[in-house]
């Protein structure tokens, strides 16, 4: 049964239903600040460098609702240069995680719960969508509407990703990132985020841990989008990957305006009987979001901030992961984040940005 609860994204509905009919029961009032913005992010004036990360706002209806709710730096859900289906429903399951989801805990399967809690402060969830897209034939014009929906002191970021196609070369894959980003700019995006925490066509690994792939994607994308601000979205680098992180950051610092960290932590998801919880081939593992990954997001922000200070890099940092309370926003800022974004909390608590702003007054 569908409830009257306000939801930016309803996990009890399919992705396509959310795309076609969401968001749900959102207050029609406009809570945007009327005063002059006092802060900046990527050179743009913003009321508060806080918003919604890529993932749960698939249309301009969703991004415009987020802007009205006072989120000032909002990501349009990651899109591709061609049509791509969503993973089967369900995509978002509540998880049974007590405290931090440490690397040690990730060795074992994570158990999915049967019901979402009323108090989402400690909620963690699966994020298993597969980066669906209806292609630029649909999203290009809708992105124009989304960009226009940003008020004074607000910024719309467009997230894009390359698509692996059968028989394609690595070069063609890397160029597809640039093509998708160029389409976003042509539609009016003032900042583009490329999702690098995705599979690499050249290997079995993830792009953001492959230095050559990251460098090529950044070079080609920056050449394609010119003066438009380029953001890269990365996953968590384990302590033993610190040298890899330093190498990659050093290579791309001249191309990127910001680094967003983190996307998710990857874990094996099972039901209470130990069986695969998410239906379908290739879905034994899923990205995990929510309260339990905050430690990893904070750790990455601190390390990126330390690298920036030590080497004189100019990139800004977007802190993402487990931002569930106003105190989490402040913790990320104290760690070195220039902007903070949430994804899980705003789904169930559309007025979360207002709570963050209220806590700062």
List each model region and its residues.
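Glycine-rich phosphate-binding active-site loops on the catalytic face of alpha/beta enzymes
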Residues: 70-84, 196, 255-267, 322-323, ...
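Alpha-helix-loop-beta-strand connector modules within alpha/beta enzyme cores
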Residues: 133-153, 207-234, 281-315, 356-361
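Active-site glycine- and acidic-residue-rich loops that bind
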Residues: 163-178, 207-213, 231-252
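N-terminal capping/small domains of soluble enzymes
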Residues: 1-156, 161-166, 356
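Glycine/Thr-rich beta-alpha phosphate-binding loop at enzyme active sites
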Residues: 19-34, 199-209, 244-313
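C-terminal helical cap(s) of enzyme catalytic domains, especially alpha/beta-barrels
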Residues: 83-101, 268-286, 333, 345-361
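Glycine-rich beta-to-alpha transition loops that act as phosphate-gripper elements at the mouths
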Residues: 54-57, 159-163, 234-239, 314-327
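Catalytic cores of alpha/beta
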Residues: 61-68, 172-175, 238-253, 306-310, ...
């Amino acid at each position: 049964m569908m409830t009257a609860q306000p939801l930016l994204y309803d996990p009890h509905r399919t992705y396509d239903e959310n795309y076609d009919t969401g968001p749900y029961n959102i207050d029609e009032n406009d809570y945007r600040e009327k005063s002059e913005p006092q802060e900046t992010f990527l050179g743009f004036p913003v009321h508060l460098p806080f918003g919604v990360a890529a993932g749960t706002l698939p249309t301009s209806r969703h991004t415009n609702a987020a802007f009205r709710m006072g989120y000032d730096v909002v990501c349009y859900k990651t899109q591709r240069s061609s049509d791509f289906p969503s993973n089967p429903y369900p995509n978002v399951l509540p998880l049974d995680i007590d405290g931090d989801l440490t690397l040690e805990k990730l060795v074992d399967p994570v158990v999915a719960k049967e019901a979402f809690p009323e108090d989402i402060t400690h909620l963690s969830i699966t994020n298993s969508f597969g980066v669906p897209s209806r292609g630029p034939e649909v999203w290009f014009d809708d992105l124009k509407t989304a960009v226009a929906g940003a008020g004074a002191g607000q910024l719309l970021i467009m997230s894009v990703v390359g698509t692996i196609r059968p028989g394609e070369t690595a070069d063609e894959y890397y160029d597809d990132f640039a093509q998708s980003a160029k389409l976003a700019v042509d539609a009016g995006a003032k900042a583009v985020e490329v999702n690098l925490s995705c599979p690499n066509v050249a290997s079995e690994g993830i792009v953001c841990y492959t230095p050559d792939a990251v460098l090529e994607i950044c070079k080609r994308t920056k050449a394609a989008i010119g003066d438009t601000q380029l953001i890269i979205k990365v996953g968590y680098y384990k302590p033993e990957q610190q040298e890899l992180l330093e190498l990659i950051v050093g290579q791309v610092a001249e191309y990127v305006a910001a680094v967003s960290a983190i996307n998710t932590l990857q874990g094996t998801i099972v039901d209470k009987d130990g069986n695969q919880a998410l239906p379908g081939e290739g879905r034994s593992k899923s990205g995990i979001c929510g309260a339990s990954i905050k430690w990893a997001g904070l750790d990455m922000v601190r390390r990126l901030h330390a690298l920036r200070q030590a080497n004189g890099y100019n990139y800004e940092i977007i802190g993402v992961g487990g931002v569930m309370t106003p105190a989490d926003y402040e913790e990320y800022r104290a760690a070195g984040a220039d902007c903070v974004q949430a994804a899980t909390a705003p789904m169930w608590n559309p007025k979360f940005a207002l709570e963050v702003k209220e806590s700062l007054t």
